[in-house]
C-alpha cells in the first residue's frame, strides 16, 4: 500500500455546501473497510469547521455494510458553532441508504485540564519496526496451528 494512495482517500470531492463524495478503495474485505468511512466522515466534518479547531470527540454508528466498489456521499449537518466549540453530524450514504452516522465535536485548543497528551510519543518510524507478517514468521512455531493459516495470508494493509 502506498502512503500516497491512502492519504488520497481523505481528499474528498465537494459536491455542494456540506455535501462531499469520497472514493472507495477495495481492500479485499467482504465490505467497505469501516476505518475508511470513519476517516472520510471526519475529513468531511473538518471541511465545515474553522481551521483553528481540532476534533476532540466523536461517536460513530455503523448501520449497514458499504460497497467498496462505489463512492460514499457524506452529508454534514452543522449542529452548532460556538466561540470555542463546533458540533457536526455526518451521514454516510450509498445507494440512497445511510450506512454510517457520526457526531463529532471540535474545539479551539485551550489551556486547562488535560486527559491525554496532545503530542505523539517518541517512537521509531514504521519502516524501522517489523511488520505483523515478519513478527508471525519469526514466531511461527509459537503460534497455534489453527491460527497460523489465519495469520499468514497476504493483506493489502501493512501493519507495524
Residue ranges, per PLM feature:
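Terminal targeting signals and extreme-terminal segments of soluble enzymes
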Residues: 1-160
Amino acid at each position: 500500500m502506498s502512503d500516497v494512495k491512502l492519504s488520497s482517500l481523505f481528499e474528498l470531492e465537494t459536491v455542494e455546501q456540506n455535501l462531499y463524495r469520497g472514493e472507495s478503495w477495495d481492500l479485499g474485505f467482504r465490505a467497505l473497510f469501516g476505518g475508511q468511512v470513519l476517516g472520510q466522515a471526519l475529513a468531511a466534518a473538518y471541511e465545515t469547521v474553522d481551521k483553528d479547531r481540532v476534533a476532540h470527540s466523536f461517536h460513530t454508528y455503523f448501520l449497514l455494510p458499504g460497497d467498496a466498489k462505489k463512492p460514499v456521499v457524506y452529508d454534514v449537518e452543522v449542529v452548532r458553532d460556538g466561540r470555542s466549540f463546533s458540533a457536526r453530524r455526518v451521514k454516510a450514504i450509498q445507494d440512497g441508504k445511510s450506512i454510517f452516522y457520526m457526531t463529532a465535536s471540535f474545539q479551539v485548543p485551550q489551556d486547562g485540564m488535560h486527559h491525554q497528551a496532545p503530542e505523539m510519543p517518541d517512537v521509531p518510524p514504521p519502516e524501522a519496526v517489523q511488520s505483523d507478517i515478519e513478527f508471525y514468521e519469526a514466531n511461527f512455531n509459537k503460534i497455534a496451528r489453527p491460527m497460523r493459516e489465519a495469520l499468514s495470508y497476504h493483506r493489502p494493509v501493512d501493519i507495524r
